[in-house]
Amino acid sequence: MPSPTKAAEAATKATATSDCSCSAASVEERGPVNAANPSSTXATSGKIGGKTQDQTAAINKPKEFAVPNETSDSGFISGPQSSQICSEEIVPDSEEQDKNQQQSAPQKEQPVVLDSGIIDEEEEHQDTTTATADSMRLKHSADTGIPQWTVESHLVNRGEQLNNLGQSSSTQITGRSKFQSSTASTANANPSGXGATSSAPPSSINIXNAWEQFYQQNDDGDTPXHLACISGSVEVVAALIRMAPHPCLLNIQNDVAQTPLHLAALTAQPNIMRILLLAGAEVRDRHGNTALHLSCIAGEKQCVRALTEEFGATEIHEAHRQYGHRSNDKAVSSLSFARLPADLEIRNYDGERCVHLAAEAGHIDILRILVSHGADINAREGKSGRTPLHIAIEGCNEDLANFLLDECEKLNLETATYAGLTAYQFACIMNKSRMQNILEKRGAETVTPPDSDYDSSDIEDLDDTKMYDRFGDPRYFVSYNGGNPMTVA
């Protein structure tokens, strides 16, 4: 007689089978799901009366099922559903349940948060006092790397001086000394140092080493002194001179070998030129021209006067007062016996003096100033030995020739060039009949030019093209080759 437990189990199976509208064969067909786990199969067969062989045969026996038309489901019930049908008898193990749950659980995508810049309503209702306090603490504790003296720097206020470069006894720049006092007061007010920036302020700049900053060259080689001379700022030039520990800094050349004195001459700044000369500026440009050479070429009378007039006692005394702190090398002390007319005899790299440059440019007023300061009017230039009178004849400048003949008492009409030609002979060779008549009236010796290869045809051959054709002809070298033409490659 079957036990009550087995009868209850059989009734439960029958009820589940009827509810799912499945046949007994379908229930037996579910056996392979549990058959995959031998322990589960053994437990099932033990509870059903130990008919393992019959149940296995029933499972292995092929069955035919009615496939629904709506879906392609084969009719098998998955593991979790079969566990409900089989109730306590057919229960998969924990590993099988975990695997099924992982397969059935959908993968959740990570939410993508896009910041639209709109403040949520929750954030709007937050305590603004706390947020403000946090942000303020962050601002106070942040180190931006900017020195405090840079933030507190300002221009002239209430008539205060921007700097104290004009005071000979001062040793510090005013802006930096103000910072030191403000730093001391800040330190007394805040001894703990909370909220202070970590970057320490730079040390005060002394006048003794400030020239290193103010005499740096830019991409064109110009220093602040060059730029100040171009702009015509006399006060800035004087302040830069006071900072220079040695006069050689005033002779720094730019990329075209121009010093501040050259730029002052080119821009017609006589006052700046005078200051630079008192401070000991000199040196030539890339063509060997001094500031006086450039002024003679440009015809600037005021600049020429500033460069040729001797220093007065007042100027020398003022120079000692302003620049005496760096005169230990006798750069300024030598001004007491310096004489500027000595510079009138300096030649440039073409061998030309100031009188030659002024004569070539036709500046009679400049020549008058040079002659009044003792310039040699009979000086010969370095290339061919021409004097200013030869230059006037070559350019057929009657006004210049009349000035030289009338006002220059030391003019020598018989001064010859390196080729031995006087002014009258030079006029004959150049076919300047008007100039010959002027010289004859002034008492020049009417001597014909000496027999030489220097004639009017040679002057025409000075053209570059004719010179090339002349030397390009092999017959030109016949006389130098023993009568045999020289082959020119």
UniProtKB/Swiss-Prot annotation:
GO terms for cellular component: cytoplasm; cytosol; neuromuscular junction; subsynaptic reticulum. The gene is cact. The modification Phosphoserine is found at S45, S135, S384. PROSITE patterns: ANK_REP_REGION, ANK_REPEAT. GO terms for biological process: antimicrobial humoral response; cellular response to tumor necrosis factor; dorsal appendage formation; dorsal/ventral axis specification; negative regulation of antifungal peptide production; negative regulation of canonical NF-kappaB signal transduction; negative regulation of hemocyte differentiation; negative regulation of Toll signaling pathway. InterPro entries: Ankyrin_rpt (IPR002110), Ankyrin_rpt-contain_sf (IPR036770), NF-kappa-B_inhibitor (IPR051070). SUPFAM superfamilies: Ankyrin repeat (SSF48403). This is NF-kappa-B inhibitor cactus. Involved in the formation of the dorsoventral pattern. It inhibits nuclear translocation of the dorsal morphogen in the dorsal region of the embryo. Its main location: cytoplasm. It is found in: Cytoplasm. The keyword tRNA processing does not apply. Residues 69-86, 163-180 have a biased composition (Polar residues). GO terms for molecular function: NF-kappaB binding; protein sequestering activity. Residues 1-26, 181-203 have a biased composition (Low complexity). It comes from Drosophila yakuba (Fruit fly). The modification Phosphothreonine is found at T174, T308. Residues 1-138, 163-203 are annotated as: Disordered. Keywords: ANK repeat, Cytoplasm, Developmental protein, Phosphoprotein, Repeat. ANK repeats lie at residues 220-252, 256-285, 287-316, 350-379, 384-413.
